[in-house]
Every structure is written in structure tokens, then in C-alpha cells.
Regions:
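Secondary-structure end/capping motifs
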Residues: 241-321
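Bacterial lipoprotein signal-peptidase II cleavage site
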Residues: 21-35
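Hydrophobic/proline-rich hinge and linker segments of small-molecule sensing/allosteric domains
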Residues: 27, 120-140, 223, 227-236, ...
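Conserved C-terminal helix/tail region of periplasmic/extracytoplasmic solute-binding proteins
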Residues: 311-354
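Short, glycine-/small- and polar/acidic-enriched structural segments
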Residues: 31-178, 194-200, 216
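Pocket-lining segment of extracytoplasmic ligand-binding domains
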Residues: 182-276
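Short, solvent-exposed loop/beta-turn-alpha elements that line the ligand-binding surface or hinge
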Residues: 68-74, 220-225, 292-301
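Sec-dependent bacterial lipoprotein signal peptides
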Residues: 1-22
Length: 354
């Protein structure tokens, strides 16, 4: 009997240890929000971004070397290009990306899909810069009945905005076509689609290069015309382990914003150089000027807009319930950098961890 009790005790101990090890494995995984020890500067940082004017801060920072300068020689910068938010979300959740410039909609999705564990929103990047542009003969929403409208990708920021707007306009017979922005430009020129809800510079390209006109500027749908088109997110584990690396990237972000404010011509040139390198073609002066006129580069994440953005996913039919966003924001690194630069702190609107 004593041997049997001893065997049961050993089994219980083994199970307890196994459970503890299992818990440790989850805590150390890429999808955990559990605190991790500060390990100093990262050996490398994988930075995601899009070849769009709405990601101007990222493009400027890469072109001018701001991120690399702020990171220093001890951290390798690995820029990683994406064309739409859902693909970047997959990279973040899979642990193959550390920090990403991304649309507000996919950022919310990344937080929701990981049950609030894997990512934190650490800064704003761009407000504005998205429009529904259409054929010249379309003068009102009701003219879109039975038509095809394009956007970049199912579930991305513009896809949610378009589908929400269509639902509010009761345009249930409009077909939404998800396709690459360059394909959209070609399709519009051929008359295959009636319009598209696009980020800059693509809305400007359809206007300047293909004769489209603006039916809806998304600015008109938001208070003060401000809404978060592009934000910056980080893997929670990377933030905990390498806070100084995160701060360095955010300093590069501030540098990019400063250039845009003090020397807009050079900021535009920097963006155009990056677009040429990434896509093989640069923007005409008319398109570049129009695209820049519709955006605001800002580190303010406009956190107060996010509950509405979450609800918009339900209205758009891409989510059954609005994701809960408490704990999504961690502006500690940003506010440290802003304070050092003598700038006012950013507000998380109660969506940070308490």
C-alpha cells in the first residue's frame, strides 16, 4: 500500500511539473502577452510595411536611413514588404515579423485572432488617405446599383470601410472585388469595374491617370476628418524582450515625420525613390502631390476611433461581434520617445492595459 501511495505521489508530482512546463512554453511562445525579461537590443528587427503613400513614414525612414541610424550597428534592420494587411497579420501571428506598419482593420484582427496575446499597437503613422473613386457618370451612391467596386483585399482596412458604407447605403446588389491595386487601375481603365475604395497613391492614380472622380473621401465620414489609416504594431514578446529596439524604431518614425513637416519636397522624393525601387515605377508629380495632400503623418494612434472601427467590422459583415480592444494599446515606448523629443504624450483612450 505504501508503494502504491508513493507511486501515486510521484505521478501527481510529474503531472504538476508537466503542467508547469506546458505553461512556460505558452508564456514564451509568440502568442503570449506574459511578461518576458528585457534582453537588451535585438540582433535584428523585421519591419513590415506596404509600398503605399499611406505608409510614407516607413518609406521615408527606410530611404533616409532613419531606422538604421537609430537602431545602430548592433541591430540588423530587415525591411519586409507586404501588399495588404491580412498577409502581414499572418506574418505577425506566425512570428516571422517583429514590427509592422499596418492598416487599423488588420491590426484589430491580429489582436482579436490571438485573444489579445500576440500584438500591441504602439503608435500611429498616418491619418486619412483613402477614397472611393468612380466613373465620371456616377454622381450618387444609388448609381452604383448592380455595379462592381474593387478594394485591395478581403478584410483589409479599405474592404471594411467599403462594405460598411455599402451596408449603410443599402446597396446590397453591389459586387465587391478584391484585387491588387495595380490590377484595379487596369480594370478601371478597361471599364471592367465602376470604381474602387483605395488607399493612396492608388486613389490619386485612378483620378489622375484614368479619369476617375471622388464619390466618397473617407475623411468626410469621421469627426474632424481624422481616422487611423496606418498604425504601428509589435509582437508582444518582442516588445517585452527588446524595448530599446522598439524605441529606436519609433525615433526613426519621428524623424520621418519631422522631415515631412520641414522639407515636404524631400519627403515626397524619398517616398518616390522607394516606390520606384519596390514597384519599378515612380509617381508623377501630380499624383504624388495629390496623394500627400490627402494624408497626415502623425504618431497619434487616434485611439478613440478604434471602438467604432471594431463595430464597423460587424456592420461590414466581416465579423460576427465587435472585438474587445482593452489592452490592445501599449504607448509606453512611444510616450517615452515623445517626452524625450519634447512632444506631448499620446492617449490610449482607455484601451491600454490597466
Amino acid at each position: 500500500m505504501r508503494a502504491q501511495r508513493r507511486g501515486i505521489g510521484l505521478l501527481a508530482t510529474a503531472l504538476t511539473v508537466l503542467a508547469m512546463l506546458s505553461g512556460c512554453t505558452r508564456a514564451g511562445g509568440s502568442d503570449s502577452a506574459a511578461p518576458a525579461a528585457d534582453q537588451g537590443a535585438a540582433a535584428e528587427v523585421r519591419l513590415g510595411y506596404f509600398p503605399n503613400v499611406t505608409h510614407a513614414s516607413a518609406l521615408i525612414g527606410l530611404d533616409k536611413g532613419y531606422f538604421a541610424q537609430r537602431l545602430g550597428s548592433g541591430t540588423k534592420l530587415v525591411p519586409t514588404r507586404f501588399n495588404a494587411g491580412p498577409d502581414e497579420v499572418s506574418a505577425l501571428l506566425g512570428g516571422s515579423l517583429d514590427i509592422g506598419f499596418i492598416g487599423s482593420g488588420p491590426a484589430i484582427n491580429a489582436f482579436a485572432k490571438s485573444d489579445g496575446r500576440t500584438v500591441r499597437l504602439i503608435s500611429g503613422a498616418t491619418s486619412g488617405g483613402a477614397q472611393l473613386v468612380v466613373k465620371p457618370e456616377i454622381t450618387a451612391p444609388q448609381d452604383l446599383h448592380g455595379k462592381i467596386i474593387a478594394d485591395p483585399q478581403a478584410g483589409n482596412t479599405q474592404d471594411v470601410a467599403l462594405k460598411k458604407w455599402l451596408a449603410e447605403q443599402k446597396l446590397t446588389d453591389v459586387s465587391v472585388q478584391n484585387e491588387d491595386n495595380a490590377v484595379t487601375l487596369d480594370q478601371f481603365g478597361k471599364g471592367a469595374i465602376a470604381g474602387a475604395w483605395l488607399p493612396e497613391p492608388w486613389s490619386s492614380r485612378l483620378v489622375a491617370d484614368a479619369g476617375a472622380k471622388v464619390l466618397v473621401d473617407e475623411k468626410s465620414l469621421w469627426p474632424q476628418g481624422r481616422f487611423p489609416t496606418t498604425v504601428v504594431v509589435v509582437r508582444t514578446q518582442f516588445l517585452a524582450q527588446h524595448p530599446q529596439t522598439v524605441q529606436a524604431v519609433l525615433r526613426g518614425l519621428l524623424d520621418a515625420g519631422s522631415l515631412a513637416a520641414t522639407d515636404p519636397a524631400e519627403a515626397k522624393a524619398a517616398v518616390n525613390r522607394q516606390l520606384k525601387a519596390l514597384t519599378g515605377s515612380s509617381l508623377s508629380p501630380a499624383v504624388l502631390d495629390r496623394a500627400f495632400s490627402s494624408i497626415e503623418l502623425t504618431t497619434d494612434p487616434l485611439a478613440s476611433r478604434f471602438p467604432q472601427l471594431a463595430q464597423d467590422q460587424v456592420t461590414a459583415g466581416v465579423a460576427k461581434t465587435a472585438p474587445k480592444l482593452t489592452g490592445f494599446f501599449d504607448l509606453t515606448a512611444l510616450n517615452t520617445v515623445l517626452a524625450q523629443a519634447g512632444k506631448p504624450a499620446a492617449d490610449a483612450a482607455g484601451l491600454d492595459a490597466h
